[in-house]
A protein has these predicted regions:
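Oxidoreductase cofactor-interface core, primarily capturing Rossmann-like NAD(P)-dependent enzymes
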Residues: 5-11, 22-31, 38-161, 165, ...
Length: 171
């Protein structure tokens, strides 16, 4: 079984808790592959710098661990095919050869969904091997806006410049 989103159901009950309950009642589940998020590795119960969705991933991991369900956590960074890097970036790439994103001094290492899929498939083929493990998946390099622009330039075979934009302007 693969769990992707720990979204809330009926207030305080979460999909994660319902899945754990069903898995324990069924009793024959080999593994739950939980698709989490890389930020979870830096979080604590009292940390405040992350989004609501990141907090839900953090809590979902703990619920799965506490439940006794056989689980493997997959923690990818942002997906390379995330709309942030595709749909939202396309107009400026097409019209001005610019990658315009609200990155500031930030860096990221986007990962291809196909790489994540291969990891999940490997876990599902041999689930007993990884029970209790956490796989943190990243792309090949940690890039700033200029590095992302360089990668786009290689793929598009034309010069692309990276341009930071304030988040307030971008949204």
């Amino acid at each position: 079984m693969t769990l992707v989103s720990p979204g809330p159901i009926h207030g305080v009950r979460s999909a994660t808790a319902v899945i754990c309950d069903a898995a324990l009642e069924y009793g024959q589940l080999e593994v739950v592959v939980n698709m989490s998020q890389m930020t979870v590795s830096q979080m604590t119960l009292t940390s405040e710098g992350e989004s609501h969705q990141h907090r839900l991933h953090y809590l979902a991991e703990h619920v799965l661990n506490w439940s006794g369900v056989p689980v493997v956590h997959i923690r990818p960074t942002v997906f390379l095919d995330n709309p942030l890097f595709t749909w939202f970036a396309v107009p400026a790439l097409r019209e001005r050869d610019l990658l315009v994103l609200p990155f500031g001094t930030g860096r990221t290492s986007p990962i291809a969904t196909s790489d994540v899929a291969r990891t999940v498939a490997a876990v599902l083929v041999d689930p007993a091997h990884g029970i209790g493990d956490v796989y943190e998946l990243t792309g090949p390099a940690s890039l700033d806006i200029d590095g992302l622009a360089t990668e786009n330039a290689l793929g598009l075979r034309r010069p692309i410049r990276g341009t930071d934009i304030p988040h307030e302007t971008w949204v």
